[in-house]
Structures are given as structure tokens and as C-alpha cells.
């Protein structure tokens, strides 16, 4: 059989040649693989979540967690978030804390595996991209996101982006200042961070 006959048979049967899938972009890690958060601001973890307002429009939520203190350091609630938006938020958090993290742990999302993020991190922050399909390697922020989903997003319907920002911000404040963690000696993250001697 030649290729013309094969094409004719495919066409008669209404079949199509499968399109090649685009390969997922993978970030290039610049930090050592075995990174431990043995003090505040050593390792920050970043991850995204999605929700919708009642009109069906998407909400994108980014959270930045200090892996040692478990504090939610910052984040954004927007309709869309680019790598440049995330860089602005990371700069804001670093300015507020007076330092950048040694390592930023994240997945391979397009906002994180972009050229702008690599340029921003070069020389000042090590990037540690977890392997695709292994979210447990970013466990602290995944655990945080699970609580955010169960205790905030699943029990609230957001009428607007502004309402979502306020409700999520209030939840994050409560998480930082009132939620006790057994791994922190049953202290809330903010109190533990204020008394932490691991510098």
C-alpha cells in the first residue's frame, strides 16, 4: 500500500492523524537536589491553585511559604498571573523580610519555568524545580494548599475578585497567627518565626 491509498482510507473513515503533543517545559534547577530548610528564609516554596467566581471566571492563587517557619509569606489572587507578576511579588516579600531566600522550590509551571524567572534568580536565588508528577517533593506548600482548599475555597463562593482577595487574605492571616503546628512546638507560624533562633 502506498501513502496515497492510506490517506484516502483514513479520509473515508473520518480519521485524523494524531497531533504531536507539545513537550512540557521543564525548569532548570540551579540549587542542589538535597535542600533542607534548616532556618528561616533558607527555602521558600511556591505553588498555584485555581478557583472560580460565581460567574465562572477563573481565579489564580499563588502562595509563598517559608518551609522552616511554615509561614505564608505572601501571595496573589488574580485572574491571571505571569512570571513577571510573580517576580514582583517575590521582590515585595523579600523587601518586607529584608532578604531573599537561598532556594526557591517550585514545580514546572509556565510562570516558574520561564526565562524571566531564570534571569531574576541568577546569582541571587537558587531555583529547585521538583520533577513533573511528584508534588510530594513540594510537600509544605502542597499541605498549605490542601488546607486552603478545604477550609477556605471549598466553603466560600466568591462573587468578585475583590471578595476572593479579602477572604483568602483573612484566611492566610488566621493561618499565620492562630493555627498551631505540632512541628513548631504547637505554636502558630508567626509566633515561631518571631522566636526562632535558627538564623
List the predicted regions and their residue ranges.
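Charged DNA-binding/catalytic regions of mobile-element recombinases
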Residues: 1-199
Amino acid at each position: 500500500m502506498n501513502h496515497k491509498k492510506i490517506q484516502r482510507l483514513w479520509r473515508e473513515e473520518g480519521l485524523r492523524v494524531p497531533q504531536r503533543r507539545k513537550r512540557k517545559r521543564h525548569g532548570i534547577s540551579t540549587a542542589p537536589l538535597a535542600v533542607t530548610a534548616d532556618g528561616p528564609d533558607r527555602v521558600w516554596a511556591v505553588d498555584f491553585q485555581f478557583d472560580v467566581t460565581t460567574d465562572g471566571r477563573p481565579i489564580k492563587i499563588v502562595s509563598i511559604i517559608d518551609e522552616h517557619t511554615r509561614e505564608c509569606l505572601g501571595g496573589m489572587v488574580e485572574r491571571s498571573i505571569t512570571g513577571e507578576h510573580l517576580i514582583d511579588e517575590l521582590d515585595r516579600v523579600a523587601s518586607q523580610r529584608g532578604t531573599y531566600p537561598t532556594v526557591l522550590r517550585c514545580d514546572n509551571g509556565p510562570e516558574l519555568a520561564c526565562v524571566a524567572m531564570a534571569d531574576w534568580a541568577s546569582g541571587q536565588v537558587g531555583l529547585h524545580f521538583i520533577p513533573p508528577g511528584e508534588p510530594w517533593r513540594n510537600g509544605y506548600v502542597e499541605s498549605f494548599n490542601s488546607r486552603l482548599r478545604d477550609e477556605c475555597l471549598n466553603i466560600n463562593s466568591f462573587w468578585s475578585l475583590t471578595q476572593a482577595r479579602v477572604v483568602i487574605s483573612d484566611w492566610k492571616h488566621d493561618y499565620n497567627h492562630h493555627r498551631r503546628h505540632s512541628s513548631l512546638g504547637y505554636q502558630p507560624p508567626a509566633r515561631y518565626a518571631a522566636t526562632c533562633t535558627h538564623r
